[in-house]
């Protein structure tokens, strides 16, 4: 199994947790981004640099991932595509996207997008809290334990 990171928007503290986990468990980790990233020197960690452009990283991930791979993303449409491809999608806050909750998340995303298009301020996500960081680490550990 492989962990994929939609890396351009993934917080550094979450990437650091993922790096340590990949090295500790000998799990392949692939960062996909449209800008250069630094990461630890490890045979289990690599990056893919995609062209700048709308959804290029998303397309690369969905084209190369396999069923049961884990994708770390806050991008709801990408999470939906991962689920269709039988992968597991998790947000950097530790929230698992599932077939049961992804439609609601897509609907909420679309409503917020319509509000923004109409000039409404919907605000962005709050800063990552210590509790969310812990939730992410715990959810990752559960996935790693199940996948080995």
From Swiss-Prot:
It comes from the Bacteria. InterPro entries: UPF0178. It holds the Pfam family DUF188. HAMAP family: UPF0178. PANTHER family: UPF0178 PROTEIN YAII. Belongs to the UPF0178 family. NCBIfam families: PRK00124.1. This is UPF0178 protein lpg0089. It comes from Legionella pneumophila subsp. pneumophila (strain Philadelphia 1 / ATCC 33152 / DSM 7513).
């Amino acid at each position: 199994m492989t962990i994929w990171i939609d890396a351009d928007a993934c917080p550094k503290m979450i990437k650091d947790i993922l790096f340590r986990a990949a090295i500790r468990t000998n799990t392949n980790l692939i960062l996909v981004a449209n800008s250069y990233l630094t990461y630890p020197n490890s045979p289990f960690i690599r990056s893919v640099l995609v062209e700048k452009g709308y959804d290029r990283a998303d397309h690369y991930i969905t084209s190369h991932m396999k069923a049961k791979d884990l994708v770390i993303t806050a991008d709801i449409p990408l999470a939906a595509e991962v689920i269709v491809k039988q992968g597991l999608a998790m947000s950097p806050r530790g929230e698992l996207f599932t077939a049961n909750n992804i439609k609601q998340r897509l609907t909420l995303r679309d409503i917020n997008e319509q509000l923004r298009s109409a000039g409404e301020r919907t605000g962005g996500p709050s800063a990552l809290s210590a509790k969310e960081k812990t939730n992410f680490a715990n959810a990752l550990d559960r996935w790693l334990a199940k996948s080995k």
